[in-house]
Amino acid sequence: MESQLTRPYGHEQAEEPIRIHHPEEEEHHEKGASKVLKKVKEKAKKIKNSLTKHGNGHDHDVEDDDDEYDEQDPEVHGAPVYESSAVRGGVTGKPKSLSHAGETNVPASEEIVPPGTKVFPVVSSDHTKPIEPVSLQDTSYGHEALADPVRTTETSDWEAKREAPTHYPLGVSEFSDRGESREAHQEPLNTPVSLLSATEDVTRTFAPGGEDDYLGGQRKVNVETPKRLEEDPAAPGGGSDYLSGVSNYQSKVTDPTHKGGEAGVPEIAESLGRMKVTDESPDQKSRQGREEDFPTRSHEFDLKKESDINKNSPARFGGESKAGMEEDFPTRGDVKVESGLGRDLPTGTHDQFSPELSRPKERDDSEETKDESTHETKPSTYTEQLASATSAITNKAIAAKNVVASKLGYTGENGGGQSESPVKDETPRSVTAYGQKVAGTVAEKLTPVYEKVKETGSTVMTKLPLSGGGSGVKETQQGEEKGVTAKNYISEKLKPGEEDKALSEMIAEKLHFGGGGEKKTTATKEVEVTVEKIPSDQIAEGKGHGEAVAEEGKGGEGMVGKVKGAVTSWLGGKPKSPRSVEESPQSLGTTVGTMGFSDSGGSELGGSGGGKGVQDSGN
């Protein structure tokens, strides 16, 4: 039934204009016009019901209210009664009413003039709602509704031209119910595309015809909107107006020879090239002399010549054209640098990148070596002096190891080392090697200079607080005074292994954080263990050797007393018994073997106290 109601919609329109003709004849009679209005409203309600059943049922209530307003308005305005009905017929989707009204030329003129007054209250509410269902029928049910709008535009063209100001409010009032913002856009009739619904508004708002741009344009658009729509979706990508601009832009991209194409990108490229030249101009210029000697650079300069000749060819890359533009600069040195950069970046061949990346590294290495030499020759503070000394010492440590190994192998100290080896077997082999080296070096080098080292060490300790104890500084001072071999061993001692680090950390914690008593107990225990393991004969021999060497240095008992004072001061404990003090250097030597002079703690014990102890026991 609904579809049947919509299809005879055309016949109902044919009947309605006939009834509208009678009010045209009775136009000046208010009563006849009011009757015609009622009849037309009834027909309009039927059509509305048939249309709104398709999904616009919410319009019934508002339309009924609008009908009430329409009935009141003719009584108020008098003569314009018929005109509102005629306008309703033209707007509600019954375009034949307007067409027949157009046939009666005189009443049509009177018909459209007053609606300017009545359109705002009446047509705004009543006639917009019928338009929505009609437009839905136009879009969904297609061709039947499309034929009618054409009829309206045919008759209403001259009407729209004559009384365009009155019909602008028609368009505004029609779309007022859909949104207040749509009223302002509806007057030009081409703007509210985005504001209105996709189906209705797109078909209506684009009135293509010049004559139909006002009132009939809304109706006739149903036929001719595809033309505008074809242009409109292309508007972002390229409509008739935009396609020309887009095609020009594409030609700019594909063909850089155009003046417009060269205008944008190469300027930015120039700015980038200039930035790089200003940042790296001194290095680049100095580097350019080297780079020209390489065959890859000759290739690149050949490319630069080609870019000079073919600067305007479209096949050129942006970088080469950029190089061509950059060659216009007055200074040729800068031009070469810029051209090198310009070609390296866009072309991106390995020959171009690898020399750039490799040569600066070589140059940086040479500069770094120069910097290192300058730092070594010109240290500013004591800490830097010691750091530079330790770095130089570490470089010579391997040769020093060989020297010490030769000394330990060919002198009589090897026996002492072997005598200590059964005690040191408990520790790792690397630790035993450290202990043996320490025994030999301390016995030979540090004994005659102990007093001097003690004084200098105390002064350096006061001046240079290092991470460990001051004995590490003492050892470094000793190494500087005793020569390259002592420095090498001290540097080895200052570079501990992982095991040595762990031991030195534990010892340092015990020494510095109030663990002196525990350290003394452990030292005495180690002394007892070593006394048990080492034969008494070897201990006596070790003591004899130690006393002999001490007498050669500065006297045995004086040295023993000094060792006692140093050990007790470092360990922060009470002076031990003579037995424990004499044997504690041996245990300290063993612990130094375990620590391997790893850190400040181990170097403390081994540098002075441990050194003397190893001298007593090992030799």
UniProtKB/Swiss-Prot annotation:
GO terms for biological process: abscisic acid-activated signaling pathway; leaf senescence; response to abscisic acid; response to cold; response to salt stress; response to water deprivation. The keyword Membrane does not apply. Signal peptide: none annotated. Residues 62-73 have a biased composition (Acidic residues). InterPro entries: CAP160 (IPR012418), LTI65/LTI78_PGEED (IPR057059), LTI65_LTI78_N (IPR056605), LTI65_LTI78_NYQTKV (IPR057058), LTI78/LTI65 (IPR037491). It comes from Arabidopsis thaliana. Belongs to the LTI78/LTI65 family. It comes from the Eukaryota. Residues 404-511 are annotated as: 5 X 5 AA repeats of [IV]-[AMS]-[EST]-K-L. Sequence repeats lie at residues 404-408, 442-446, 460-464, 490-494, 507-511. Keywords: Phosphoprotein, Repeat. Residues 188-197, 245-254, 583-593 have a biased composition (Polar residues). Residues 9-33, 175-186, 221-231, 276-309, 323-337, 537-555 have a biased composition (Basic and acidic residues). Residues 603-613 have a biased composition (Gly residues). Residues 1-383, 408-429, 461-485, 537-619 are annotated as: Disordered. The gene is LTI65. Induction: By low temperature, and mostly by water stress or abscisic acid (ABA). The modification Phosphoserine is found at residue 536. PANTHER family: LOW-TEMPERATURE-INDUCED 65 KDA PROTEIN-RELATED. Residues 36-48 have a biased composition (Basic residues). This is Low-temperature-induced 65 kDa protein.
